[in-house]
A protein has these predicted regions:
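Charged docking surfaces used in two-component/phosphorelay signaling
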Residues: 18-26
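Acidic, metal-coordinating helix/loop segments flanking the phosphotransfer/catalytic sites
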Residues: 33-53
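Active-site residues of response regulator receiver
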Residues: 57
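Receiver (REC) domain active-site loop signature in two-component systems and cognate sites
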Residues: 60
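Alpha4 helix (beta4-alpha4-beta5 surface) of REC/receiver domains from two-component response regulators
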Residues: 67, 88-105, 118
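Hydrophobic/aromatic residues positioned on beta-strands within the core alpha/beta folds
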Residues: 84-86
Length: 129
């Protein structure tokens, strides 16, 4: 049995989902990547106790990252959710949306992958909010 934290990645851009997964594996995490949020949600509903962190994009078809986060919370209220976004809008609006969806952390694009690993590690070891 692995003691490495498991991370689920959801991004509708296949190349990015694969890149995140590869980076996570090289950084010491187990990862599973999805490009369809509905498939990811179905998987998560059956495996919600296996993941320490869920990383997702905000802009996705069928179910955006905020809607996805709210659905995830129906299965697990303590999993850490990291939202990756290039979505630009009023800061107070974003903060309210993040709070409502119980987003644990946000990384805004563009970002450097070397900065993501420590943020995920911090989420994995931080106490439940």
């Amino acid at each position: 049995m692995s003691t490495r934290p498991s991370v689920m990645v959801v991004d509708d851009e296949k190349e990015l989902a694969n890149l995140y997964g590869l980076f996570l594996e090289r950084s010491g995490f187990n990862s599973v990547s999805f490009t369809d949020p509905l498939s990811a949600l179905d998987h998560y509903s059956q495996n919600h106790d296996k993941y320490s962190v869920v990383i997702m994009d905000w802009k996705m078809p069928n179910l955006d990252g905020i809607q996805f986060a709210k659905k995830i919370r129906e299965y697990n209220t303590t999993v850490k959710i990291l939202l990756i976004t290039a979505y630009s809008t009023d800061k107070s609006f974003k903060e309210e949306v993040y709070r409502e969806a119980r987003i644990s952390d946000v990384i805004e694009k563009p970002f450097k992958f070397k900065d993501v690993g420590p943020r995920i590690t911090e989420l994995c070891v931080s106490k439940v909010q």
